[in-house]
Amino acid sequence: MAPTTPATHDPALSHGAPPTQGSQAPANAAPNLTPADISGMQLNGLDQSQIMNLLRSLPGMFTGAKIPDQGQGNPKEDAAQTLSNLAQASSPFGGQHLPIHYQTGAAGGLPGINDPGPSTHPRGPPNLGQLSAVAMQAAPATIQHQDQQQSGRQEDGEQAGNTSIDSPSAKDGENGTGEFNQTSTSTPSGGRRGGRSATMGSDEWSRQRKDNHKEVERRRRGNINEGINELGRIVPSGSGEKAKGAILSRAVQYIHHLKENEARNIEKWTLEKLLMDQAMGDLQAQLEEIKRLWEEERMARTRLEAELEVLRNMNGVSTAGAGSGAAKDESAAGTKRRSTDGADAAGTNVEGGNNDNAEGERDGKRQRTE
């Protein structure tokens, strides 16, 4: 049965041939490599001459090893020998392990499926515990850099907050435009401070609480001042006072006055409505009575017209006969009246002649007497 792979071993590197006891050797000890093994290494696609140039450019790294000059001997064997000497030499950094970096490219990256296993790896499998330790050492540096950036932003926010707090506030009796401007000015700094999370109970947390309380109080005062100024513009002012207390007092008096007027108007409107309803009821009763009388008169007239028509039909002939008899009587009476008038006129003439004769005789007798 094959031995199991240890927990610190990379599974991607163990693909291929089964691991051996030699592959589990600690990474601290430099393996005994031959020049042939080192000559088969591929460092990121570099040839042997480039490797030698890189090794020569490193200062203070090869005090105990001799590097052949360029152009002497076989470059391939020289590079392999130099790498073998470096592997066997002690570390110049006091035994501190250097992290192994792999290039994430097509050439020289992490070993794939078709790459050789740990048994043929030139320096043995990488120690994952060592890589984790290196990562943990690099993490505090990143955290420290972030803390420095946060402290810089915090100082900027505190300066902006102090600037907004130190600005002069508006007086209590005047309009609240100054406080409203302070609120709008200090809002961005408060938003930046609120975006950071501080530890509960720390100085930064207490400072944030105080700043938030000041911001809320400033907004509340601004709203109160704005409302009082609006009341001062609405409520009629006899003396023209602009103090907040005077404005509130006048507003209360004006509200009481409006409520009293409303009560009086409601009472008056109710009485007028009752009187109007009563008058409308009386007019409706009179209208109904007039309609009834008119209907009775119309029916009586229709009845009388019908009776008159019946009487005319019944007395039509008798009326015509009575009319002809009356005409005859009138003609006879007229003839008799004319004859009587002629006789009377003749008698009157005779009497007049007789009288004239008598007077003439009396005159003659008087003349003879004289």
Swiss-Prot record:
UniProt cross-references to InterPro entries, sorted A to Z: bHLH_dom, bHLHzip_scCBP1-like, HLH_DNA-bd_sf
Protein's name in the database: Psilocybin cluster transcription regulator
UniProt main location, coarse: nucleus
Any one Pfam family match given in the protein's UniProt record, by short name: HLH
Entry coiled-coil feature ranges: none
Superkingdom, natural source: Eukaryota
Biased composition (Low complexity): 183-202
Keywords: DNA-binding, Nucleus, Transcription, Transcription regulation
Natural source organism: Psilocybe cyanescens
GO molecular function: DNA binding; DNA-binding transcription factor activity; protein dimerization activity
Localization per record: Nucleus
